[in-house]
Swiss-Prot record:
GO cellular component, one term: small ribosomal subunit
Alphabetical GO biological process terms: ribosomal small subunit assembly; translation
Function statement: Protein S19 forms a complex with S13 that binds strongly to the 16S ribosomal RNA.
Keyword rRNA-binding attributed: yes
Superkingdom field: Bacteria
Keyword rRNA-binding: yes
Protein name: Small ribosomal subunit protein uS19
Keywords of this entry: Ribonucleoprotein, Ribosomal protein, RNA-binding, rRNA-binding
Gene3D superfamilies to which the protein is assigned, alphabetical: 30s Ribosomal Protein S19, Chain A
Organism from which the protein derives: Campylobacter concisus (strain 13826)
Entry GO MF terms: rRNA binding; structural constituent of ribosome
Pfam families, per the entry: Ribosomal_S19
Family that this chain belongs to: Belongs to the universal ribosomal protein uS19 family.
Gene that this sequence comes from: rpsS
Family matches, as InterPro entries: Ribosomal_uS19, Ribosomal_uS19_bac-type, Ribosomal_uS19_CS, Ribosomal_uS19_SF
Length: 93
């Protein structure tokens, strides 16, 4: 179910404070965050976020196309190494 329009997008307060501080200071340093649930809003355009994926921080540069998505959508948490298959099948192809 989608979020109600009258509520507006969800952004953690501590992330928004860091965004405002970075915009006011014209700071290009990445903003380190564990808040994967925060929605990307227009104030974040041009900033780089280091989003935690459970193991390390993934740099995410925010552009206009990212608005409305969550920060966590750009930092995958699972690695797919392929389905297990026998060596003979791979050699035969």
């Amino acid at each position: 179910m989608a979020r109600s329009l009258k509520k507006g997008p969800f952004v953690d307060d501590h992330v928004m404070k860091k965004v405002i501080a970075a915009k006011n200071a014209n700071d290009n340093k990445p903003i380190k965050t564990w808040s994967r649930r925060s929605t990307i809003v227009p104030e974040m355009i041009g900033l780089t976020f280091n989003v935690h994926n459970g193991k390390s921080f993934i740099p995410v540069y925010v552009t206009e196309n990212h608005i409305g998505y969550k920060l966590g959508e750009f930092a995958p948490t699972r690695t797919f190494k392929g389905h297990k298959g026998s060596v003979q099948k791979k050699i035969g192809k």
